[in-house]
Amino acid sequence: MVKTALTAPEGPPSDVEEIKEKSDYLRGTLKEVMLDPISAGIPDDDNRLMKHHGSYLQDDRDLRNERQKQKLEPAYQFMLRVRLPGGIATSKQWLVMDELAHKYGNGTLKLTTRETFQLHGILKWNMKKTIQDIHSTMLDTIAACGDVNRNVMCTSNPYQSEVHHDVYELAKKLSDDLLPQTRAYHEIWLDEEKVAATPDTEVEPMYGPLYLPRKFKIGVAVPPANDIDVFSQDLGFIAIIENEQLIGFNVAIGGGMGMTHGDTATYPQLAKVIGFCTPEQVVEIAKQVITIQRDYGNRSVRKNARFKYTVDRLGLENVKEELEGRLGFALLEARDYHFDHNGDRYGWVKGINGRWHYTMFVEGGRIIDYDDYPLMTGIREIAKIHSGDFRLTANQNLIIGNVTSHKKKQIEQLIQEFGLSDGQQHSALRRSSMACVALPTCGLAMAEAERYLPRLIDKIEEIVEENGLSDKEITIRMTGCPNGCARHALGEIGFIGKSPGKYNMYLGAAFDGSRLSKLYRENVGEEEILNELGSLLPRYAKEREEKEHFGDFVVRAGIVKETTDGTNFHVQ
């Protein structure tokens, strides 16, 4: 059998590729422009490089028009994202992040859909000190954004403590071993002296001088929980457990959520399982998958540059064959597994190690003190006495983890004192909601998401309650643009911002994260959304089969067609 020759797409390099090529391994002129007192912003070329250091330049879009009228530059600020593999932070790290949010940020913390922290509202003059303070807690922001491997996720699963520990250690190893090797970050932010490279020095043996064509995301799931949406990842590992022992992983490749409105050549896609590997093989598999994307990904058209398009263009079997050739061994046959949900399980759970875990509901992932709900203060007080850890979940919630029996009562008292919610007073719909930041800080947002979804759910809850569905979990997700940070295409009800107050509405994703949704209504506002759900939810309440989820119902009832693959996502 003749091996298929793989090729990269032809075409001139994109502007970002040219910026990376000239950047001296992600240095650019960042060191100089961050010292420039004239503007609170930085040039676009340096902002493209800044992503690889874990940050984006943004501006407060609520103030944009007024500042234009006053002939002022935009209200520039930076978002800073922490690298936190597996989403686990110590109490000390939590307290430092809380302090930095108040000292340099906007007084809030954002828990992201990739299990890490974001600080918003940091001014240019405070960036270096903020990064140094983060570094002092043994954390960093390296490769939290950019054309590299991003934050590695793993299931926040307190039910299987031993397996979770093994998977978490693997997530950390993946994150560390796949880091860029350039010292640019350390020189710019931590004042490390630059060492001149010798001619035979290979600065980036894995990534190369151009890094990857686009971002790359890895996640590790522990069935039956698919809380990390493993099929949304460029590279996913599904833990296989036998006799309560981790024996290996199924390997899935080629997932991703982003697309571009109006361009059917872009689409969300689910990763496909290609085989099984042992725990010892995971890191090498990840490295070789990354090099395949490095060599064959699209460096000409960025909207088609994600690994999912590389896999679909080259063919799944051809990519698998190339991977096995680079590895020098064949993947074994995939093992059986079962997912039953992609949400979180709330409240207290006792792990098999005798430690306790309390999962809190954090709406929109925003840690803030509300007028009637001192959420941020309450968690801060717990962090002061907590000897365990904090686990940031992929659904933007928070687990107070590894609580000892003698500390549990003390923490329970603080939970009660500050009213820290496990979400049981809310509908299951609200507990199953997720939204990206969107306005006012995200430059890509076309509509609201985090600030609006809770208000929309207020009104949907009336329909839910009228139809006896308050305790029925229905995943609902909203993003301000089609990039998919809140994994909208895996929501049983999904909204993608189209313009202020207008959204594309999607239905029919699987409750366990194994099927994409389908476009149901285009460019609808709140009134149309409520009218549609006012018709659909009563039908679901009356016509559903036993234990049938909403996403399955709308497909079975013919309300939307089933999306069998990302390549037919746009087919109506």
Curated annotation (Swiss-Prot):
Binding-site residues for [4Fe-4S] cluster, renumbered to this chain: 436, 442, 481, 485
Gene Ontology MF, one: heme binding
Pfam short name (any one): NIR_SIR_ferr
Record field: catalytic activity: hydrogen sulfide + 3 NADP(+) + 3 H2O = sulfite + 3 NADPH + 4 H(+)
Superkingdom of source: Bacteria
Amino acids binding siroheme: 485
Biological pathway: Sulfur metabolism; hydrogen sulfide biosynthesis; hydrogen sulfide from sulfite (NADPH route): step 1/1
Co-factor binding details: Binds 1 siroheme per subunit.
Names of required cofactors: siroheme; [4Fe-4S] cluster
Gene Ontology biological process terms, A to Z: cysteine biosynthetic process; hydrogen sulfide biosynthetic process; sulfate assimilation
EC number(s) on file: 1.8.1.2
GO cellular component: sulfite reductase complex (NADPH)
Function: Component of the sulfite reductase complex that catalyzes the 6-electron reduction of sulfite to sulfide. This is one of several activities required for the biosynthesis of L-cysteine from sulfate.
HAMAP family cross-referenced by the UniProt entry: CysI
Family: Belongs to the nitrite and sulfite reductase 4Fe-4S domain family.
Protein name: Sulfite reductase [NADPH] hemoprotein beta-component
Organism: Bacillus pumilus (strain SAFR-032)
